[in-house]
Amino acid sequence: MNIHALLVNRFTEALQEMGVENAPVPVSRSARPEFGEYQFNGAMALAKQLKQKPRDIAEKIVETVKLDDIASKLEVAGPGFINVHLNDAWLANQCELSLTDPRLGIAKSPEQNIVVDYSSPNLAKEMHVGHLRTTIIGDAVVKVLEFLGHNVIRQNHMGDWGTQFGMLLAHLSDKLQEEVAETALSDLEDFYREAKVRFDEEEGFADRAREYVVKLQGGDAQCLALWEKFIDVSITHSEEVYDKLNVSLTRKDIMGESAYNDDLANVISDLKTKGLAVEDQGAQVVFIPELADKEGNPAVYIVQKSGGGYLYATTDLAAMRYRSGKLNADRTLILTDARQALHFKQTEIVGRKAGFMKEEQTYEHCPFGMMLGSDGKPFKTRTGGTVKLVELLDEAVERAGKLIAERDNDLSEEELKEVARKVGIGAVKYADLSKNRTTDYMFNWDSMLSFEGNTAPYLQYAYTRVKSLFRKAGVDMATMPVDIKLVEKQEHALAVLLMQFEEVIGMVSREATPHVLCTYLYDVASAFMTFYEACPMLKEGIEPQVRDSRLALSALVAKTLEKGLTLLGIETLEKM
């Protein structure tokens, strides 16, 4: 059920009946409950066109619009706002329909092919905290899009190519004289550090490293076999992180930089043929007048170095062409940090001019801010090094275990381990997902593991509280009677929120903003707590019909929280 879309349709029909065509139909949620749940704000914009006072137009719309089945009251307020108060019986019926629907009343969207490029770690090193945001925001967006019925193609654009691999392969070749690759590469950070020290300090090693680059790029069989072994072990490290994070990426989603190697020369050739790429100081560049500086100098987009080497720009153009052509993507979403915003803006302009995309295909860079430490600087170890993601997640589980052990619970040792895992990982993910992705945020263990406020533990606890309620009532959620009556204001407020789930999911799918879903789930959990205190269910003297109605509403809360958290990639618990 999408109340917003329903109201837009009804107001559009009313305006057409009044002879007003193609007018904007601004419907928004009301700021305060006394103004109803929704508000139509279009009368003021029509005043000039209709040569009438906004309030008179609003009165006419109220007379014309057909909302008797939905609204208990329509009122004109201020200069011409129309406040919509939703009908309790209609709301109750919508809640009943949602409760008996596996999709909770959320309709599927017209199917699109949507490519989502996310995670994309550099395989020369282990995944670190800088990979957290792209991985979990991307995966949440993917899950929402798939839930809405889209054909989503995950693209893990892993950094598996480049000059640094010459240094790494030369070092690996030496290490394999004494140990197997899995042992040699058990700690990629240490391995990278050792190779870098040798490159900087050991006589002759840098030359060997450069030879390996030439061999690798030339397709030398022995060198490629060594490279494949390195990549295989590195991907296994990434898979360990994906498994801990409960994200849906698999090996079949990998489309690394090397996958585009064969097309890079064609990209340059096509850019030259179309008069876009020109030589400048030996390099091939595209000038972009659309992004000129204040002096009118066009932006310079380098696609091939003077020595003939290719750049990220070349690979990203090849990826654009592959996704738009071979994969036939209606939308391409790319999740990287905000520092790459200009690069992707340039890539889109050049790619569209080159005809690598159709006009109707979208290319959406979804930038995100950085994770900061308590000092307000990028999150690091105490010694200033990068924090391995796997170590951060292990610490989260350990901290969660200690916190839960301190609380009153009847959990067995095995249950405690499982609860600690779900709470710890959920806390890290939710702390990130709940922030607007375009802003930086400060990492804080205490706030993210709190059982109060907008946190994963609070939402997981709210879910277990509903499940506990049903255990105490001796009622099976799957077979319970579904007959909802909304009498108290807390019941009404909770029902309105529950019926806004589809609006929220739609917003996340359009804008790639999981924080909107987090805020919604927190609002639902908070409204449930208020409802739970004001509307008792298991007290003596509560009429069976009232009890059953409130339990049904509680069941819809549980299903909404479970579905919402699942879409965010966060697991729920039966008890904690």
UniProtKB/Swiss-Prot annotation:
Coiled coil ranges: none
Cellular location(s): Cytoplasm
Pfam family, one: Arg_tRNA_synt_N
Name of the top EC class for this enzyme: ligase
GO BP annotations listed: arginyl-tRNA aminoacylation
Database matches in SUPFAM superfamilies: Anticodon-binding domain of a subclass of class I aminoacyl-tRNA synthetases, Arginyl-tRNA synthetase (ArgRS), N-terminal 'additional' domain, Nucleotidylyl transferase
Keyword field contains Ligase: yes
Cross-referenced PANTHER family: ARGININE--TRNA LIGASE, CYTOPLASMIC, ARGINYL-TRNA SYNTHETASE
Family indicated by similarity: Belongs to the class-I aminoacyl-tRNA synthetase family.
Protein name per Swiss-Prot or TrEMBL: Arginine--tRNA ligase
